[in-house]
């Protein structure tokens, strides 16, 4: 963050400001992303009272100034998504419709399939899990975390058996031990509910 602050002071460009805003908004949640033992804490379960509100306010202020220059770039769009998450007092208050709109912008800017994958989660929250699953069906199922997203959306749709199976499958494809443990716990939780 310190280096990006220096870069932003030296280079007056909205994308440099967007990067700084994105870094601040993500860093503001650092203390709540993991629990003891390195256990991952999903965004919806994070203690928002422990988020760094000063850092969030600074990130939002920098983002607003960058967006006002009307030269949208990838980092600004990512920061806008992070700001919408940070703005919600509870997970339920998240403005998923706006987040979908920002993912649409980000997909146009980048063409990145992982952006489209992340968008399916937002669609599932904004329009319901079946809409998210329909959007997911349009993507390549070999994408990293595709199976984890499918599991989450099936769980939200009430199909716990499919979700548990997919969480187990996703755990086998996990990129790291913390993610593997998280997905394994999700599968075990749903399997316990089925009994």
How should each PLM-predicted stretch be described?
Residues 4, 11, 70, 103, ...:
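Alpha-helical junction/boundary sensor with strong preference for TPR arrays
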Residues 19, 23-26, 78, 82, ...:
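"A position-specific structural signal for the A-helix of alpha-solenoid helical repeats
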